[in-house]
């Protein structure tokens, strides 16, 4: 998917990018490839592949109508090089975006990137989701939490649901169907007072399969969740 194909595909879906937005995506690509030589950010560096498998792929929640350009609080867990939240932020500049990532080098990249792209309303924190999830400044503060290929739902739910306000949504993007994951996560979701409202498979323009799962938070998360760092992965709910 060339940049032009990318812009045209978005336009056909009702998102006519300004020159500034096009420049932001172009500069994002350049910096991603440049920094990737210093720190491991992505295995995908071909321009057409980046525009398809990182940029277009990240925008699925917006293109499908689940995230709109409004001033709400979005948290991205384990965003790595900024996916999916920063492409979403470029498309929806009114969003307030926070990223938590466990690798400080990636946070350094994200700070540099956001300065270069002229993004405002973005915040980057180094640390573990389990620790931030028990911090009152972060717990139950977000309208949406996104996670792209981070962990299976049984684990992911404990890492993300505590950050949501009641009525907020976890939007999880994956490469594979999530049916079995949701079965395995049934107990975790019950314990966390959360409920799946969407589990949908779709295709990228090149035919590659993807999945989007949306979980609603129904009540306040019990205080003991998330458990301390490493436990959710070792002993899933």
From Swiss-Prot:
Cited Gene3D superfamilies: Vaccinia Virus protein VP39
TM spans (from-to): none
Localisation: Cytoplasm
UniProt entry tagged with the keyword Cytoplasm: yes
Coiled coil: none
Major place of residence: cytoplasm
Enzymatic class: transferase
Entry EC number(s): 2.1.1.-
CDD domains tied to this protein: AdoMet_MTases (cd02440)
Example GO molecular function: rRNA (guanine-N7-)-methyltransferase activity
One GO location term (cellular component): cytosol
One Pfam family from the record: GidB
InterPro entries, per the entry: rRNA_ssu_MeTfrase_G (IPR003682), SAM-dependent_MTases_sf (IPR029063)
UniProt keyword list: Cytoplasm, Methyltransferase, rRNA processing, S-adenosyl-L-methionine, Transferase
Chain sites annotated for binding S-adenosyl-L-methionine: 78, 83, 129-130, 148
Family affiliation: Belongs to the methyltransferase superfamily. RNA methyltransferase RsmG family.
Listed name of the protein: Ribosomal RNA small subunit methyltransferase G
Organism: Streptococcus thermophilus (strain ATCC BAA-250 / LMG 18311)
Protein encoded by which gene: rsmG
